Each structure stands twice: as C-alpha cells, then as structure tokens.
Amino acid sequence: MFNLKDKKVLLTGASGGIGQSIAELFSEAGAIVGLAARNEEKLKSLASSLKTKSYIFKFDLSNIENLETFVEEADKTMEGIDILICNAGITKDTLSMKMKTQDFKDVIDVNLTSTFILNRDMAKKMMRRRYGRIINMASIVGVLGNPGQANYCASKAGMIGMTKSIAQEYASRGITINCIAPGFIKTPMTDVLTDEQKSAMLSKIPEGKFGEPKDIANTAIFLASDEASYITGQTIHVNGGMLMV
C-alpha cells in the first residue's frame, strides 16, 4: 500500500465507476479527497463511505467560463491541493458524416479544454509549493482511433500531447504530469453491451477479459506516490495487452 497520508487530492468525475474506485483507494491510503462531479447525491453517498475526510464539489465541467473560479474555490476550501486527477469525460458518439459541429465542440470542451484549464491553474499553485502530481485520464482510443468517436478520440489524443508539453514545463518544479489510458474497463457503459459486442471486444484483448475500475485506481495511486517521482510526461496504458507500445 502506498502512503498518501494527509495528501490532498482533487478528483473530477468522482461519481462514476472509475472515479469511485480511485476515491476509495486514495482514502484507504490516507489521502484527503475532494470529490467533484455533477451528481451531488452520488458524491454524498461516496463521501459517507470513505475512511478519511472528504469534500464535495458539485460542478459541471462544461461550464468552462467558471472553471477558474472552481479551482480557486477548491484550493481555498481544501487549503491547498497536492494531487489533481482529471477523470471526468463525456461522449457524443456518431459517425463523422453525421456528427454535428456542436457535438464535436462539446466533447472537446469537457474532455480537453477543461483538463487544460485545471492543469494550468492547479500547476501554478503547485509550483509555489514545488510539489505536485497531476494525472489526466486519456483512453486507448486516443492512440488507436475508433469509428463513431472522432470527437472523443480527438479529445483524448489531444490530452496525451498536451500532457507531454505541460510536463516539460513543470518538471524542474517538483511536479509530475502523466496520463493513464484505459482500455475496455467494466463500467455501466459496458454492462449494456450485447454478448456479441462483448465477444468482439474480448477477441482483441490478449488477456481475454475486461479491466476493473481498481486496475485504473491502482495505476493512479502509483503515479501519485513518491515512488513515481521520476516518471513524468508519460502515458501508462492499462488495457490487458490490447495495445502494446
């Protein structure tokens, strides 16, 4: 178990399956967790189950114009943030020939633009303390591409490139910035797939199984730890061998 005692973590997308798993694991390691998402009831339920102190921030990342205020509020409320995990994201899937420009823009705004603003504003605060860990949640499709997800793939590919750039800017200040690129992970989204769809996906995964949210949480807690202090600008692929790079 990694020791994150009294480290302060701000986690977006905290109400989903992966977010919940990350929050629980970080709390078990002693971290104080700030939970951010749109669904306040889910956040309250999650907060009540954690072993350490937590904070709830009801916020919609599509509200780009108020993101800077959100960062200030979270940092002030938690009295400084050591670890930022940008886990929130949306999809608006359809073939590119049918995709509305607004649907492309909406996904880019939530998945990429908001992540940039959070990285930029939080890194500036971390720089003053000469310590910080930032983890951005990318995706295997940001590298492979995926039909019907031009907007989502663009947002995740952009996130990977952005992370490399920002990581170079802050590496000398004690701040590491990395991506995690999950493959197919068991979530409510995979639960609704037909058996035929699941079989088609599993045939592409050498391990022959979907990942669990805890697989992503375990990767995140390593990147947030002191043991990962010499790792920055990287994309850690967690996909059962579906993509080997």
Task: Describe every region a protein language model picked out.
Residues 139:
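Residue(s) in the substrate-gating loop at a strand-loop-helix junction
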